[in-house]
Amino acid sequence: MNLNQLYYFQKVAQLQHYHQAAKELNISQPSLSRSIANLEEELGVSLFQKNGRNIELTKYGSIFLEHVNHIIDEIKIAENKMKSLAGSSSGHIDIGYVFPLAKSYIQ
């Protein structure tokens, strides 16, 4: 299982349509289907069931989605925290001054 599979699963669950999810994820629909099939094989359960042209989460899919949403939320929180920490310890500051006045203060 990898992080991309979790993102893919979340998007398919949200849109309930492989083609639309693949388009939004900028991957081919066969690649998306293969990724979800590999995830289902690894978990040993079916995450989706077909309903006409659309798909629906199975009971296992619904339970797994709760965990995936939590995992992805935690990753976003961690990313934001790291960006915030990195931003507070470095950056760019522009300082302007009037030379005659600054000469007496900066020595």
How should these model regions be labeled?
Residues 10-31:
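Short helix-boundary/capping micro-motifs
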Residues 28, 35-38:
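Residues within the DNA-recognition helix of helix-turn-helix
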Residues 17-18, 36, 50:
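Helix-turn-helix DNA-binding elements, focusing on the entry/boundary residues of the two helices
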Residues 30, 80, 84-107:
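N-terminal winged-helix
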